[in-house]
């Protein structure tokens, strides 16, 4: 087996390569529109046109009004704004209880923890073993003082897609605002805010081939979480700070392109994902898929290899030119087991050997086959040197022999 000459990038859930068309537009905005979009003269108007066009493109992609799109510095800021802004707004009505899931992105988890330190109460809904949040569990947790339900649309580690429409209906039945972190969903699957019925939705440009450091929060008309950043009158006085003109232009263009070709992109990524899952589960003993397959992002494969540490596999893959992940890139410096996998009941020792492979439109079947070739060589070789694996095999053999006597 020979190494591929190019890098095989299979970590598209962490970030995606910037689309050339988006980059070209960003360079044009940086080099040509030198004015402040709030200024009332020609070069300011040129900059504002980039902002207005980007806002319209983002709004169209999720079936919203441009006036409902508020640009942020990233998806994490959008999440913080939705959660903390709602909490501070509703606290004035003596509503200080929030509901989320136990396997959210850390932008939500840490925002909730921050609010708990301020005296708010948070209920964490446990997902099923396949990685889904049940609407009936959300409804059972709602109280008279509940301010917000925040459930992610698609999990960033295992890719499971949640029944957001049904959860939003439950929340609204009780007069509770509904937010969804759709950072992994927007640009990857169809997202229609009117169909979903959510009040707020977070997104991030670099997840759909746009620039890093650029996000947005959709707020349904009439929904105003308290500002987190005060200052100027930008973003309809809801998020101060001079707009990132080039970032907004690139975000709008990238999302427009992603949604224009969404069906074929989804089919392509699903083909690669299913090939890898089927082959690995068939050819590598005890490999297991984490999360259900039926409602799952088309490009996500999260697989555990018992008896090994994910970091070891990661290094081997890197030596073969393959970029993958042991979980969320936002928590990649930690050796603790994934809170996502623990929440769905994956044992800690198995969770440590989990790998996330996420495909994008630029990936090929040749790359998917190469990944499997490498894993089929690396996993048995590493297991042969793994005390954890050998001990487990000897224990299993011991009990098997006892059963034969």
Give the residues covered by each predicted segment:
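Pyridoxal 5′-phosphate
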Residues: 1-405
């Amino acid at each position: 087996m020979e190494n591929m000459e190019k890098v095989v990038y299979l970590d598209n859930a962490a970030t995606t390569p910037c689309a050339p068309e988006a980059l070209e537009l960003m360079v044009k905005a940086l080099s040509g529109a030198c004015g402040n979009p709030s200024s009332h003269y020609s070069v300011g108007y040129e900059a504002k046109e980039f902002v207005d066009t980007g806002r319209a493109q983002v709004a169209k992609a999720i079936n919203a009004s441009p006036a409902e799109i508020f640009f942020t510095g990233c998806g994490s800021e959008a999440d913080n704004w939705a959660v903390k802004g709602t909490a501070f707004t509703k606290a004035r009505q003596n509503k200080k209880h929030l509901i989320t899931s136990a396997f959210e992105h850390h932008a939500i988890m840490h925002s909730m923890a921050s609010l708990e330190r301020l005296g708010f109460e948070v209920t964490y809904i446990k997902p099923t073993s396949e990685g889904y949040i049940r609407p009936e569990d959300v409804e059972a947790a709602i109280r008279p003082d509940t301010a917000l339900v925040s459930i992610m649309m698609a999990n960033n580690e295992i890719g499971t897609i949640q029944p957001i429409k049904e959860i939003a209906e439950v929340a609204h039945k009780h007069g509770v605002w509904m937010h969804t972190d759709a950072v992994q969903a927007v640009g990857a699957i169809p997202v229609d805010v009117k169909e979903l019925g959510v009040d707020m939705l977070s997104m991030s440009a670099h997840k759909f081939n746009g620039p890093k450091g650029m996000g947005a929060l959709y707020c349904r008309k009439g929904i105003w979480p308290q500002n987190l950043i005060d200052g100027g009158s930008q973003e309809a006085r809801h998020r101060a700070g001079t707009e990132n003109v080039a970032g907004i232009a690139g975000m709008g263009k990238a999302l427009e392109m992603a949604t224009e070709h969404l069906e074929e992109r989804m089919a392509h990524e699903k083909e690669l994902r299913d090939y890898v899952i089927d082959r690995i589960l068939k050819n590598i003993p005890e490999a297991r898929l984490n999360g259900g397959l039926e409602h799952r992002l088309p490009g996500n494969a999260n697989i555990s290899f018992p008896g090994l540490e994910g970091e070891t596999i990661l290094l081997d893959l890197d030596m073969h030119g393959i970029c993958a992940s042991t979980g969320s890139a936002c928590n990649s410096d930690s050796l603790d087991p994934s809170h996502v996998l623990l929440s769905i009941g994956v044992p800690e020792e198995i969770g440590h050997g989990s790998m996330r492979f996420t495909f994008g439109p630029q990936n090929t079947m040749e790359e998917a086959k190469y990944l499997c070739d490498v894993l089929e060589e690396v996993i048995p070789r590493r297991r042969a040197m793994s005390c954890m694996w050998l001990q487990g095999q000897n224990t299993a053999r011991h009990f098997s022999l006892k059963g034969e006597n």
